UniProtKB/Swiss-Prot annotation:
Protein name per Swiss-Prot or TrEMBL: Myosin light chain kinase 3
Sequence positions that bind ATP: L521, G522, G523, G524, R525, F526, G527, Q528, V529, K544
Keywords: ATP-binding, Cytoplasm, Kinase, Magnesium, Nucleotide-binding, Phosphoprotein, Serine/threonine-protein kinase, Transferase
Native species: Pongo abelii
Task of the protein: Kinase that phosphorylates MYL2 in vitro. Promotes sarcomere formation in cardiomyocytes and increases cardiomyocyte contractility.
Length: 819
């Protein structure tokens, strides 16, 4: 019994052990299957690599065969004959080449001389046009008449007769008005005449006044003149004493006595301007126009003074040495501009070249000038005979005078020096004026003398202004020369509307916009772009009409709208509205009228310099950098998808986001579209794309801008793609000969097959080629608009600060000083 039971138990335990063994066996088989699968995958990878290696070896073998074929020598007999023939013809070819080089050099020199001549003529024409554009002198020259010679309607026959007699008594060396007109056409004489006067001004007595004037260091008091006041027997040369009739009328008619001065005294705060083309050097015969009435009032306090220039008559008897020291001989006509303010008892006379000096009013008593004897009213510069006060200076001359005055860098400094050297008996006072107070105050014109104190030597102001004018001409800023080319490096203008989030409207576009079907701005695989106008605002826009045939097409349009809703940059086109219909979708976008960048490249009339390409490329990189910051890939960058804002500027906007995609780092994106000429190698190989894909296209565009050629263009699309896959390109020797190494380095670091080796948009913006634009502009002899605007801003700030200083000082003078 016990034996049978044990046997039965042994047989029952065997099935349990078998099941455990089978389970273990299954696990091992599964593990073996997994390992076999891994081996198979590894084998496939190895096979692919071997196949690619075989293909590379095949390419290498074909290349070696081509190289051997190109180096293989020809038949022995014919080769020797050909070498002898070619060697015999070499000297003749060299001589012809040398002759051609000499002829080309001669022609180049001639063309360069002709170009310089044409440039000089252009600058001269521009200068003459700018000078006479708003001047009445042009009318005088064209009409052949001299209006200031005409008698005033208010002049009596007796006065006209006296004027004719006085004009007949002039010396022969006095210039006529016609001579003044002819000399006004030669601006080159101005600097010579100013230099002559600058050499003689050192022998003149100094100007002693409370206002601004010439530099005190430039004038030396001559011996024998106490305190710079001429004696009773001294007078300036070439001056006639005031007529007796004028002396008799002076105390009776003060308004007529004002006519004896260089300028008519207008209302307080008004400015009197003398045209730069109508004033001449000192002459003789000046006392004839002293007592003429003034029937015609001045407009804005301006007047022309032709004929002999302002003279300073005084008592007769000046010796010949003083005469030579004052006039320096017969001086030809001189062009100048005067601004005079008559708001205070001591009038300030201002020249347009930075010279300021006081003039004496007619109501100053003669007792204030001890040691000086003469008729009343002789303390001011007198007006030449035949001068008409009714003639007006053009508005441009008044603006030119103020501009030239403000361009003098030593104006404020000279004012402070002159104040320090003022006489103890004089005290500056604030001139009261209405609207012109701020303008004139900035130039330091609001100074006068206290009543009862005269100007000891007002006549010296006429000659002391000449060297200051000549110095101001030499101080012309370097930005004022004509003929220098200015490049607009300013950023692209923003869209004429605020950035908005656009949603598709299922209405007709004609409800709110007027589309010009006949005016096509562009087109492509998507459809056409027409110009349109918003009916409510009249805003010019562009309507991109996209044909849709399937649901996928509509999804692509919505993807483009979603991407453009995220873009708000000046170098990226902005979306304004969107409409959807049964067969099409319409995107209303910002409108620019400069045309495609591709047209700039292909236009033979438009020559792109390297600096132009730098400006274009920098803006392209800025737009691409903004896209990549928002994780957007354009994937269709090409010159046709870059628009210029205008026909001549360098501002661009990137368009056409139909192929753009949102980049997600965890997702692998593959695309198989785009223009073959600008595709990156990873797109051709249908591999994963990323930000470097756009940078490859930027490199191709830069290459085309620099050379006008395409680096990978083949005869067919297949050949083009083969060049791209092999990254087969080089710098064309002819087109890249004169370009900088920085430009070549920029392109070389973008057209790299390995994506990780290409520069990013941030690195491109930091590249040396796209930076330091002022130095590049200086080397290419051009100027940047940003530099001009910066200089203008700095000058405005400087003069504004000076204006505040002068205004504050003038306000402080209002407070009475303690006794």
């Amino acid at each position: 019994m016990s034996g049978t039971s044990k046997e039965s138990l042994g047989h029952g335990g065997l099935p349990g052990l078998g099941k455990a063994c089978l389970t273990t066996m299954d696990k091992k088989l599964n593990m073996l299957n997994e390992k076999v699968d891994q081996l198979l995958h590894f084998q496939e990878d190895v096979t692919e690599k071997l196949q690619s290696m075989c293909r590379d070896m095949g390419h290498l073998e074909r290349g070696l065969h081509r190289l051997e074929a190109s180096r293989a020598p020809g038949p022995g007999g014919t080769d020797g004959v050909l070498r002898v023939d070619t060697q015999a013809g070499w000297p003749e070819v060299l001589e012809l080449v040398r002759a051609m080089q000499q002829d080309a050099a001669q022609h180049g020199a001639r063309l360069e001389a002709l170009f310089r001549m044409v440039a000089a003529v252009d600058r001269a024409i521009a200068l003459v046009g700018a000078t006479f554009q708003k001047s009445k002198v042009a009318d005088f020259l064209m009409q052949g008449r001299v209006p200031w010679r005409r008698g005033s309607p208010g002049d009596s026959p007796e006065e006209n007769k006296e004027r004719v007699e006085e004009e007949g008594a002039k010396p022969k060396h006095v210039l006529s008005a016609s001579g003044v007109q002819s000399d006004a056409r030669e601006p080159g004489e101005e600097s010579q005449k100013a230099d002559v006067l600058e050499g003689t001004v050192e022998r003149l007595p100094p100007i002693r006044a409370s206002g601004l004037g010439a530099d005190p260091a430039q004038a030396v008091v001559s011996p024998g003149q106490g305190d710079g006041v001429p004696g009773p027997a001294q007078a300036f040369p070439g001056h006639l004493p005031l007529p007796t009739k004028g002396e008799a009328k002076a105390p009776e008619t003060p308004s007529e006595n004002l006519r004896t001065g260089l300028e008519l005294a207008p209302a307080p705060g008004r400015v009197s301007v003398v045209s730069p083309s109508l004033e001449v050097a000192p002459g003789a015969g000046q006392g004839a126009s002293s007592s003429r009435p003034d029937p015609e009032p001045l407009e804005e306090g301006t007047r022309l003074t032709p004929g002999p220039g302002p003279q300073c008559p005084g008592p007769p008897g000046l010796p010949a040495q003083a005469r030579a020291a004052h006039s320096g001989g017969e001086t030809p006509p001189r062009i100048s501009i005067h601004i005079q303010e008559m708001g205070t008892p001591g009038e300030m006379l201002v020249t347009g070249r930075g010279s300021l000096g006081p003039t004496l009013t007619t109501d100053a008593p003669a007792a204030a000038q001890p040691g000086k004897q003469g008729p009343p009213g002789t303390g001011r510069c007198h007006q030449a005979p035949g001068t008409e006060p009714g003639e007006q200076t053009p508005e441009g001359a008044r603006e030119l005078s103020l501009l030239q005055e403000s361009s003098s860098p030593g104006g404020v400094k000279a004012e402070e020096e002159q104040r320090a050297g003022a006489e103890p008996g004089t005290r500056p006072s604030l001139a009261r004026s209405d609207d012109n107070d701020h303008k004139v105050g900035a130039l330091g014109l609001q100074q006068g003398k206290s009543p009862g104190v005269g100007n000891p030597e007002p006549e010296q102001d006429c000659a002391a202004r000449a060297p200051v004018r000549a110095e101001a001409v030499r101080r012309t800023p370097p930005g004022a020369e004509a003929g220098s080319m200015v490049l607009d490096d300013s950023p692209a203008p923003p869209a004429p509307f605020e950035h908005r989030l656009v949603s598709v409207k299922e209405t007709s576009i004609s409800a709110g916009y007027e589309v010009c079907q006949h005016e096509v701005l562009g087109g492509g695989r998507f459809g056409q772009v027409h110009r349109c106008t918003e009916k409510s605002t009249g805003l010019p826009l562009a309507a991109k009409i996209i044909k849709v045939k399937s649901a996928k097409d509509r999804e692509d349009v919505k993807n483009e709208i979603n991407i453009m809703n995220q873009l708000s940059h000046v170098n990226l086109i902005q979306l304004y509205d969107a409409f959807e219909s049964k067969h099409s979708c319409t995107l209303v976008m910002e409108y620019v009228d400069g045309g495609e960048l591709f047209d700039r490249i292909t236009d033979e009339k438009y020559h792109l310099t390297e600096l132009d390409v730098v400006l274009f490329t920098r803006q392209i990189c800025e737009g691409v950098h903004y896209l990549h910051q928002h994780y957007i890939l354009h994937l269709d960058l090409k010159p046709e998808n870059i628009l210029c804002v205008n026909q001549t500027g360098h501002q661009i906007k990137i368009i056409d986001f139909g192929l753009a995609r949102r980049y997600k780092p965890r997702e692998k994106l593959k695309v198989n579209f785009g223009t073959p000429e600008f595709l990156a190698p990873e797109v051709v190989n249908y591999e994963f794309v990323s930000f470097p894909t756009d940078m490859w296209s930027v490199g191709v565009i830069t290459y085309m801008l620099l050379s006008g050629l395409s680096p990978f263009l083949g005869e067919t699309d297949a050949e083009t793609m083969n060049f791209i896959v092999n990254c087969s390109w080089d710098f064309d020797a002819d087109t890249f000969e004169g370009l900088s190494e920085e430009a070549k380095d920029f392109v070389s670091r973008l057209l790299v097959k390995e994506e990780s080796c290409r520069m990013s948009a941030t690195q491109c913006l930091k590249h040396e080629w796209l930076n330091n634009l002022p130095a590049k502009a200086l080397r290419s002899k051009t100027r940047l608009k940003s530099q001009l605007l910066l200089q203008k801003y700095i000058a405005q700030r400087k003069w504004k600060k000076h204006f505040y200083v002068v205004t504050a000082a003038n306000r402080l003078r209002k407070f009475p000083t303690c006794p």
